[in-house]
Amino acid sequence: MNRQPIVQLSNLSWTFREGETRRQVLDHITFDFEPGEFVALLGQSGSGKSTLLNLISGIEKPTTGDVTINGFAITQKTERDRTLFRRDQIGIVFQFFNLIPTLTVLENITLPQELAGVSQRKAAVVARDLLEKVGMADRERTFPDKLSGGEQQRVAISRALAHNPMLVLADEPTGNLDSDTGDKVLDVLLDLTRQAGKTLIMATHSPSMTQHADRVVNLQGGRLIPAVNRENQTDQPASTILLPTSYE
């Protein structure tokens, strides 16, 4: 029996007005994401990667089409229902860490959960467990300005996973880091999501960030185009994908 896709995009389009004309960023995309897989969304700056993640999460609504997450038609819901669903079921990791400077590492992770009604004690237990997993158990009382960029992103990843979301969206999560630090942070993100069986959709402009993905799709001309490997063999790892010439 085939598994039901966790995310289904159906005829999804998004346009915006630029002067007297309308620009089409996403063009009637239909695509399924499977439970527990890591999909790398590869595209140049301005190709619409962030917009697509915003539509999946319900931050924005499409011009046409639908997004369904585990049977929940998020595009058809009210703003309040979309917000509550996002809070409970989706974890988001951004390029910029967005940590609150006046809160400690532990408090940055626990605050969203406390605002959602989780007890302070329970939120702290979860946060400490995540900090242990990302190698920052000794930094829970540290403030963000005392952390390196890689450490701040580890905290942001922990915050995104603290509520045990079914879906994790990562928008250029290593884009503000140097190459070595970015690789280590990506390893942390992949380890945590795979251990927990989460679906991870990561937007990136860097082909090197796609090598561990289960699937790679290129966002070009408003469309999602599945990548193929150089030998045209489906059993090859994602690191052998054939990239559009604009990325090579």
Curated annotation (Swiss-Prot):
PANTHER family: ABC TRANSPORTER RELATED, IMPORT ATP-BINDING PROTEIN
Subunit description: The complex is probably composed of two ATP-binding proteins (Rv0986) and two transmembrane proteins (Rv0987).
Swiss-Prot/TrEMBL keywords: ATP-binding, Nucleotide-binding, Transport
Superkingdom of origin organism: Bacteria
Result of knocking out the encoding gene: Disruption of the gene reduces the ability of M.tuberculosis to bind to host cells. Disruption does not reduce virulence in a mouse model of infection.
Entries under CDD domains matching the protein: ABC_MJ0796_LolCDE_FtsE
SUPFAM superfamilies the UniProt entry points to: P-loop containing nucleoside triphosphate hydrolases
GO cellular component, one term: plasma membrane
Induction section of the entry: Highly up-regulated during the early stages of invasion of the human blood-brain barrier.
GO molecular function terms noted in the UniProt entry: ATP binding; ATP hydrolysis activity; transmembrane transporter activity
Identification of the protein by name: Uncharacterized ABC transporter ATP-binding protein Rv0986
Function, in words: Probably part of an ABC transporter complex involved in host cell binding either through secretion of an adherence factor or through maintaining the architecture and integrity of the mycobacterial cell envelope.
GO process terms (BP): transmembrane transport
InterPro entries: AAA+_ATPase (IPR003593), ABC_transporter-like_ATP-bd (IPR003439), ABC_transporter-like_CS (IPR017871), ABC_transpr_LolD-like (IPR015854), MacB-like_ATP-bd (IPR017911), P-loop_NTPase (IPR027417)
Family in the record: Belongs to the ABC transporter superfamily.
Record-listed ATP binding positions: G43, Q44, S45, G46, S47, G48, K49, S50
Residues annotated as domain ABC transporter: 7-246
